């Protein structure tokens, strides 16, 4: 499940530094998009509900045919116990990092790091806002949709590239 906003909808790419002082962007989106903490924890606070992870798939790919370098792609829906889909997340890991750190595909990455007391940080590369008929059908709500992608670091080394798309329903919990 890959979404290419450019091919089927309008999109605006926004740098993280453009969000801070923009008064037209609701505070909820600033917190969700720029927060350094676990989205799963933020989701619990925002919605006053436990979050649920719906594991879509975990696949292994090689970068080049017959290459010894393998990558893991994990895709999940995160929602609350009202069964709302609030986020789609796709993460790419080198297989060594994935096997060393991530043992339970049905657990949220943020929860894993928090409960394990692992020190990690993220470097947000890009934020985007756009409309997509495909996303409206998957989330079952009209757009626009915010999204971001970032690199996750552990012990100063990159371990994962994460791509997230957020449901407009998050605005209802303000």
UniProtKB/Swiss-Prot annotation:
InterPro entries: Chorismate_lyase_/UTRA_dom_sf (IPR028978), Rv2949c-like (IPR002800). Keywords: Chloroplast, Plastid. Pfam families: Rv2949c-like (PF01947). The keyword Chloroplast applies. Its main location: plastid. One of its GO terms (cellular component) is chloroplast. It is found in: Plastid, Chloroplast. Belongs to the ycf21 family. This is Uncharacterized protein ycf21. The gene is ycf21.
């Amino acid at each position: 499940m890959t979404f290419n906003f450019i091919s089927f909808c309008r999109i605006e790419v926004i740098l993280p530094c453009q969000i801070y002082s923009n008064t037209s962007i609701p505070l909820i989106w600033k917190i969700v998009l720029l927060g350094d903490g676990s989205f799963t924890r933020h989701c619990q606070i925002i919605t006053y509900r436990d979050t649920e992870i719906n594991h879509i798939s975990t696949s292994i790919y090689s970068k080049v045919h017959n290459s010894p370098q393998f990558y893991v792609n994990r895709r999940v829906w995160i929602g609350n116990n009202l069964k709302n889909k609030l986020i789609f997340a796709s993460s790419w890991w080198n297989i060594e990092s994935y096997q060393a750190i991530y043992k339970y595909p049905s657990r949220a990455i943020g929860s894993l790091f928090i409960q394990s007391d692992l020190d990690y940080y993220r470097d947000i590369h890009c934020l985007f806002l756009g409309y997509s008929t495909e996303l409206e059908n998957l989330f079952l709500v009209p757009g626009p949709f915010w999204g971001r992608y970032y690199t996750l670091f552990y012990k100063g080394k990159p371990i994962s590239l994460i791509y997230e798309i957020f449901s407009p329903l998050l605005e209802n919990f303000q």
